[in-house]
């Protein structure tokens, strides 16, 4: 199944931040995700790469989102993504990461892409591995609520 990246609009982001479903797009029954509000806050921010809705090509239904942000002056972006639980294990996350990597490789300012996968979600690490990322280290990061969590850091040179 194919995923298309569709840029998240300001109107869609405002709806998500208000706790509503975005208008103008069809969404999966269990959308938005816990990740959605954080992604919506990034719309229009300087230094962002995306964010994008993950839209199934066959029916245009939104099943998640993906985006990245520049984290240093050397051209490193850190990406994050989420797929609604009802659509897990269908290749959508891998397709989305691969599509974002393709976009990143087309942008001359992007030199390196990093991602963190929580230890309790090994399937996220497999997604990154399938997309060509290499495991760098196990480290600590903050989750959406500001809690420190153990993660695996993955990296891909462009």
Roles of regions detected by a PLM:
Residues 1-78, 82-86, 102-103, 107, ...:
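GNAT-family acyltransferases
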Residues 72, 89, 112-113:
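A generic structural signal for short
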Residues 81-83, 89-104, 126-130:
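Conserved acetyl-CoA-binding loop-helix of GNAT-fold acetyltransferases
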Residues 95, 112-113, 136:
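A local structural micro-motif
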Residues 98, 115-116, 139-140:
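Short loop/turn and capping residues at structural boundaries
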Residues 107-116:
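Conserved GNAT acetyl-CoA-binding A-motif
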Residues 115-125:
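Conserved beta-strand-loop-alpha-helix junction that forms the acyl-donor binding cleft
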